[in-house]
Design a protein with these regions (language model features):
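N-terminal Rossmann NAD(P)H-binding glycine-rich loop of SDR-like oxidoreductase domains
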Residues: 1-23
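NAD(P)H-binding Rossmann-fold N-terminus in SDR/SDR-like oxidoreductases
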Residues: 11, 15, 68, 153
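N-terminal Rossmann-fold cofactor-binding loop
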Residues: 30-34, 46
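Conserved Rossmann-fold cofactor-binding substructure of NAD(P)-dependent oxidoreductases
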Residues: 40-57
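NAD(P)-cofactor binding segment of oxidoreductase domains
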Residues: 66-95, 132
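Substrate-positioning beta->alpha
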Residues: 73, 147, 173-185
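Conserved beta-loop-beta element that borders a ligand/cofactor-binding pocket
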Residues: 134-156
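Glycine/proline-rich active-site loop of Rossmann-fold NAD(P)-dependent oxidoreductases
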Residues: 156-161, 187-196
Length: 204
């Protein structure tokens, strides 16, 4: 299987590359700056989305602002990627936004919903950009899946996770980046949650 990963140089992106490599995938890794990698199954690229997605079986988008105050770019970049996918006939798309993005009160505990409401007000531009990103994905005609994790950690893989459109997250919910990466690669293979927003957290 061949996948294209946008945001491959970030902390989650690196875990995606590792998970894809472990599954024997070949990868086109897209980043803002050209990177190098000794792994022959990974080809790094920058710039044009069209050349990056060409020939891919699935496209994974895991980029995001480094801080909530960064200039919003997620919706615009995603729109360009979706356009390139249509042009090249690529139909499988997976993306990470976040558990605080959008209007999902049934997936949040009361306290987490209060926090999400405050975050959406405090970082309005960034959160509206993420919501627009989700809207673009959901209104597209491709086979999409959106992953909505709570707090991401850099710890070791916990192994067991809970994932699905009805999962609830709370103030203590978290997931290791390695586990989220493994879940995304598994979904790219199996297509269990096509056309759904998937909340995901560690099962502990």
């Amino acid at each position: 299987m061949h996948v294209t990963v946008f945001g491959a140089a970030g902390r989650l992106g690196r875990q995606i590359l590792r998970a894809a490599r472990d599954r024997g995938f070949t990868v086109t890794a897209h980043a803002r700056r050209l990177m190098s990698d000794s792994e022959p199954s990974i080809e790094w690229t920058t710039g044009d989305a069209g050349s990056a997605v060409k020939g891919a079986d699935a496209v994974l988008v895991v980029f995001g602002p480094r801080t909530p105050s960064d200039v919003p770019f997620c919706a615009t970049e995603t729109e360009q990627i979706l356009s390139a996918m249509r042009q090249h006939g690529v139909t499988r798309f997976l993306c990470v936004t976040g558990a605080m993005v959008g209007d999902y009160p049934k997936n949040r505990t009361w306290c987490f919903q209060l926090l999400a409401t405050w975050i959406q007000w405090r970082f309005q531009r960034s959160m509206e950009d993420r919501s627009r990103q989700e809207m673009l994905i959901r209104s597209s005609e491709i086979n999409w899946t959106v992953f909505k994790p709570p707090r991401l950690t850099s710890g070791n893989s916990g192994g067991r996770i809970m994932a699905g459109p009805a999962i609830r997250v709370g103030m203590l919910s978290s997931i290791a980046r390695a586990d989220l990466a493994a879940a995304m690669i598994k979904e790219a293979e199996q297509g269990r949650f096509i056309g759904q927003c998937v909340f995901v957290k560690s099962a502990h």
